[in-house]
């Protein structure tokens, strides 16, 4: 039917958008794309193969990470975010499942809902925004679109990812954090790291690190 064809076409365009976005990026902690092409009406891309699983897999198998290890991963992904933000790209789906390990180095993947925005904050891509509960801030639940987003949207998700790595638990949804704050972190976590998570996961964008 026409509706199914439209849906397939929308997935094809989303797939190509992700591939074209990543293929323009060159950072040691962002997945590498080697080729993008279409054949017989189907879109393909060739990316680096990473066999070691995601940070989510590691935590599910081994439990919470040490603070030293978790911070090392987060700093490297933070560097990747700083790089894409400099190119006016928001990832918008930072979470442990989207960070793979390649020879013990974290690699950010899944730019399928990333957004490119211009200097005035207007969206220049049209794919819908996804929501990963526990990792998405309040603004991703709103109907305002990308005008309500900025780099601090990714910062919230990065802080939520650090929370998960250190506790082995998915953080509460943003609405609960907004009402009740974050649950207490384990005593073994240093005050500085606990404060960094709390700051990154502030409900209001203006209160997060920029």
Predicted regions and their residues:
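Conserved short submotifs of the Hanks-type protein kinase catalytic core
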Residues: 40-54, 58
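Activation segment signature within eukaryotic-like protein kinase domains
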Residues: 73-74
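Non-catalytic scaffold residues of the protein kinase domain
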Residues: 27-30, 55
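AlphaC helix of the eukaryotic protein kinase fold
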Residues: 1-24
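Catalytic-loop of the protein kinase fold
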Residues: 85-101
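C-terminal lobe helix-coil module of Hanks-type protein kinase domains
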Residues: 134-210
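Activation-segment/catalytic-loop signature of the eukaryotic protein kinase fold
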Residues: 36
